[in-house]
């Protein structure tokens, strides 16, 4: 587990995480995590649905102050990973619930997300053999869209590295985090 290390001041998780290592299963790691966080958002006056999320962090005007911390997200998830020598495999799942319904025409339209719940399941791998490193990740969102990033790193005589990467993100894949 690592602490938050991004430059974004608003899209972090606020909560806790626990890593469990059992002696009998020392090649496996089990992680659970939980987050409660508030986001700045504007809501439709009639329906109360979230119309837009704001990540600028400004709270200067009356409107900006009204948006401050107006939507809560509760997220819970887990991860299991297996690591043995130069092989690593993992699976992750998280589920998120917002305190308000997010309207389809909100700022998350890019991700085709609406409603008050989101989830994502993923699997990843990292395999190192001699001068090659195969790595990748697959993720399935609540829209049942499957996205992936896969690649191989080739090292030539320790003087040059070449990376080939393939990325596939369908239009209906909804990566909220």
Regions found by a protein language model. Name each.
Residues 2-177:
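Signature for the C-terminal beta-barrel architecture of outer-membrane proteins
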